[in-house]
Amino acid sequence: MSQKPFRVIIVGGSVTGLTLAHSLHRIGVDYIILEKRAKVVVQEGASIGILPNGARVLDQLGLYNTIEQSAAPPESSHIHFPDGFHFISPYPKRMFESFGYPIAFLERRRLLEILYDTLPDKTKLKVNKTVSDIEQYPEGGKYNARVRTIDGDVYEGDLVVGADGVHSRTRREMWRLSGSSPTGDVPVSERNSTSVEYCCVFGISQGLSGLRVGQQVMRIYNGRTLLVVPSKDELVFWFLSQKLDRKYEYSNAPRFTLEDAAAQCLQVADAPIADGIQFQDIWKTRQAFNMVSLEENLFKTWSFGPIVCIGDSMHKMTINFGQGANCAIEDVAVLSNLINELLLENKGMKPTFRDIEVLLRRFNRMHLSRVSDIFNMSWLVARVHAQDGLLRKIIGRYVMPYLGGRFDSRPFRMIADAAALDFLPLPRSSFPGWKMYKSREGGVVRNVFFLLAATVIVAWVCRLWA
């Protein structure tokens, strides 16, 4: 009997899942995508920001030019505080000059459309396929795993990748299988570690002239942050994040209606955005909007047997730092590199169950610290923007405006340290930031400078308030 080809089952036609499909195609790996919805491309009122670390991988896959044409990158950020102070940060422009990729804001729907339209074989994507259960076969067989959907269909493969978001069914099945194995089981404390402290109203408006493309506006309040990003064709992307009354567990996180969202937005209706324009003018021209809880968590255990979860199913962040999708794209790069390496080492022989298990543990081990750094920065940025606590209020109001580019070095270093596909050329690698900000001993000196400067400013502010 001839050997079946190595096959990956991707659960979720998300940005993460579709990017993985493109990457697997580049290394000649067979795959199938199971999407629970009837359509991949849907309007949910959401936008997405592609930063240089995500952009570079998408560029390697030949997808970025279309994305770039669909976006109007911001050049500056105008940041306003409750006491009337404001400053202009050239952070977006510096990012572009450093890495060759701007912050590309576009509709999430448009990004999904690009990823779907460019799939080499759309028959590999199956819609209306909700996963019911997953089984594994460690004792050998044609394939390592079998995925069954609620309509009774069965799909077999050697590796199952959960790219199905924060409410991941793949993750639950992985936990179920792990719990029945003497070598597995994820601690209950880890399973229940997702929490919610913030919510967000996000939306898209169109048809309002008078906003300058490239000039994003952030208004910082106590416990609340409003971000407005004007784009091309008079599109405006906006976000209103709010600290909740308490910290919730994932299982009892609040759910919101459109009426709840409208009530939140009306509270900042008179917020000035540009000359003669208030947020209520943006609200009146809304096309779509929604309100959701912002889950936060970084799971430590990403795989069991031939099953692995990536993206929001393993690391869910708030929106403020903008790295959620970009971090997921990095997951794709690291996992694809390891799969390609294993296939080359096996020289045509199909990897065994044990091979896949070892590969996934290695993926978890080598990538977790990188994701942890991004997650921790995202956690901090959300709370600085919300002025959550005295120290974080001081950092946002008195440190960030005065340290300028020094404050940019840490997020820039995170971008420079990003994973990329090691089997495809690196475009735009000549831009200075990829080498200048890459972690090295000099980075310690920069951190010491930043901490000393921040300490001096904090001490000065505390003296004023004393």
UniProtKB/Swiss-Prot annotation:
Glycosylation site list: 128, 192, 376
One Gene Ontology term from the biological process aspect of the record: terpenoid biosynthetic process
Signal peptide stretch: 1-23
InterPro entries noted in UniProt: FAD-bd (IPR002938), FAD/NAD-bd_sf (IPR036188), FAD_mOase_fung (IPR050562)
Pathway assignment: Secondary metabolite biosynthesis; terpenoid biosynthesis
Keywords for the protein's UniProt record, in alphabetical order: FAD, Flavoprotein, Glycoprotein, Membrane, Monooxygenase, Oxidoreductase, Signal, Transmembrane, Transmembrane helix
Coiled coil: none
Record localization: Membrane
Membrane topology: Single-pass membrane protein
Cofactor: FAD
Residues that hold FAD according to the record: 35, 49, 108, 312, 325
An example Gene Ontology molecular-function term: FAD binding
Biotechnology: Diterpenoid pyrones display various biological activities and FDDP E shows anti-HIV activity. FDDP D and FDDP E show also inhibitory activity of 42-mer-amyloid beta aggregation that is involved in the pathogenesis of Alzheimer's disease.
CC per GO annotation: membrane
Residue spans crossing the bilayer: 443-465
Enzyme Commission no: 1.-.-.-
Superkingdom assignment: Eukaryota
Broad enzyme group: oxidoreductase
Principal subcellular localisation of the protein: membrane
Family label: Belongs to the paxM FAD-dependent monooxygenase family.
Function noted in UniProt: FAD-dependent monooxygenase; part of the gene cluster that mediates the biosynthesis of diterpenoid pyrones. The first step of the pathway is the synthesis of the alpha-pyrone moiety by the polyketide synthase dpfgA via condensation of one acetyl-CoA starter unit with 3 malonyl-CoA units and 2 methylations. The alpha-pyrone is then combined with geranylgeranyl pyrophosphate (GGPP) formed by the GGPP synthase dpfgD through the action of the prenyltransferase dpfgC to yield a linear alpha-pyrone diterpenoid.
The protein, known as: FAD-dependent monooxygenase dpfgE
Gene name in the database record: dpfgE
